[in-house]
């Protein structure tokens, strides 16, 4: 593989995460405007965004098989066509059914693109370098999560219609589409070059189960926590502005942490540092949940920084449980994480209704403790060390 080709594929991976981050995180910014547009209460409008999450979940799950049937370049180019149709649907329709369908299509496109992006990184890089590259790729999710809400605020403040926010997000896919030209993608399944040696099917092992549970609990815990921090902070007498600043600080610190750990991870065994970070994150979340408002800003900054590397390290270790990175395995771990996203309000909504926001934060804390236990148990069964030894010879 030529260096320029590798750079193009790496940028496609970066932008695939930016696309998903922009679509998921911008929701809160535009929801009120969309509710006004359709003359609906915000609470019923939020349910239609489930179509976005459902599209992401279904496409990540199915793409484990689709990757071996439909070439990656074809998928990305077809995704561009779907993206144009979805944004056009948002712009020119006044029907809630069409809006929901467009959201589902956006979810499908972003899920397919993100699973391809993840697979490209696991395919192009080996060992510890894979972990740091995947972490840097994931930082584009957070970066888009910071940039696009600012773009949305800028447009909405000037009374520009909300659908132009999605048109701006579509520009990320335009860049991906342009990068596919003159770029060679790894061939999979029936398109892969034929070899005389029989393909040995590897068993995944129990380590994948531990990592999948950790991925689900981590994302469910993280989103369950950050979704209810503003309500919890307001209950302690903080202003809405200060409560919002806590969330912004978390994501800013999370992004800085990703950049820092993309360098730091190269010097450590991934399973050991993952266990340490998961334990630290659980402790820091407990400090935030039981601390005074005066210490909240510092504890959430520390939590964002030290938890930033957990999810991508889980995915990296998943890809290292087999000698050859398996798209099915990587997508399985990703799917478990996405199920965590889908369950966020299903799990935390009733808890908040019955026991208040702090109960939701403590539940999230319990989920982080489960992540720590899974990472600790992984140490006894993980195959990443033997596979790293093989690739280094």
UniProtKB/Swiss-Prot annotation:
GO molecular function: transmembrane transporter activity
BP-aspect Gene Ontology terms: response to selenite ion
Subcellular location: Cell inner membrane
Transmembrane segments annotated in the record for this chain: 11-31, 51-71, 78-98, 101-121, 134-154, 162-182, 206-226, 245-265, 273-293, 297-317, 332-352, 361-381
Segments on the Cytoplasmic side according to the record's topology features: 1-10, 72-77, 122-133, 183-205, 266-272, 318-331, 382-393
A single GO cellular-component term on record: plasma membrane
Membrane protein topology class: Multi-pass membrane protein
Ranges of the Periplasmic topological domain: 32-50, 99-100, 155-161, 227-244, 294-296, 353-360
Induction entry: By selenite or tellurite. Maximal expression was detected at concentrations of 10.0 and 0.5 micrograms/ml for sodium selenite and sodium tellurite, respectively.
Keywords for the protein's UniProt record, in alphabetical order: Cell inner membrane, Cell membrane, Membrane, Transmembrane, Transmembrane helix
Similarity-based family: Belongs to the major facilitator superfamily. TsgA family.
Name the UniProt record assigns to this protein: Protein TsgA
């Amino acid at each position: 593989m030529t260096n320029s080709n590798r750079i193009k594929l790496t940028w496609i991976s970066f932008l695939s995460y930016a696309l998903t981050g922009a679509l998921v995180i911008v929701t809160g910014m535009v929801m009120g405007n969309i509710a006004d547009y359709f003359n609906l209460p915000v609470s019923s409008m939020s349910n239609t965004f489930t179509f976005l999450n459902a599209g992401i979940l279904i496409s990540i799950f199915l793409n484990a098989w689709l990757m071996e049937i439909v070439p990656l370049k074809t998928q990305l180019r077809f995704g561009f066509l779907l993206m144009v149709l979805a944004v056009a649907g948002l712009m020119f329709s006044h029907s809630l059914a069409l809006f929901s369908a467009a959201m589902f299509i956006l979810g499908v496109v972003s899920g397919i693109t993100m699973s391809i992006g993840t697979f490209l990184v696991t395919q192009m890089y080996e060992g510890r370098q894979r972990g740091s590259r995947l972490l840097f790729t994931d930082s584009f999710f957070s970066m888009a999560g910071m940039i696009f809400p600012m773009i949305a605020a800028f447009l909405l403040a000037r009374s520009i219609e909300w659908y132009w926010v999605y048109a701006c997000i579509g520009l990320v896919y335009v860049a991906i589409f342009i990068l596919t030209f003159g770029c060679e993608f790894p061939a999979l399944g029936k398109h892969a070059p034929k070899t005389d040696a029989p393909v040995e099917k590897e068993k995944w092992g129990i380590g994948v189960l531990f990592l999948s549970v950790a991925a689900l609990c981590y994302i469910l815990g993280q989103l369950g926590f950050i979704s209810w921090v503003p309500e919890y902070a307001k209950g302690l007498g903080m202003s809405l502005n200060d409560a919002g600043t806590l969330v912004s600080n978390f994501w800013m610190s999370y992004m800085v942490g990703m950049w820092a750990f993309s360098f730091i991870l190269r010097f450590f065994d991934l399973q050991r540092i993952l266990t340490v970070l998961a334990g630290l994150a659980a402790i820091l979340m407990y400090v935030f949940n039981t601390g005074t408002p005066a210490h909240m800003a510092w504890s959430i900054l520390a939590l964002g920084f030290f938890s930033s590397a957990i999810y991508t390290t889980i995915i990296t270790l998943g890809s290292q449980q087999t000698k050859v990175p398996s798209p099915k395995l990587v997508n399985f771990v990703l799917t478990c994480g996405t199920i965590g996203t889908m369950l966020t309000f299903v799990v935390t909504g009733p808890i908040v209704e019955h026991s208040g926001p702090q109960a939701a934060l403590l539940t999230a804390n319990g989920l982080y403790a489960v992540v720590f236990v899974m990472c600790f148990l992984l140490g006894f069964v993980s195959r990443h060390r033997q596979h790293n030894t093989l690739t280094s010879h």
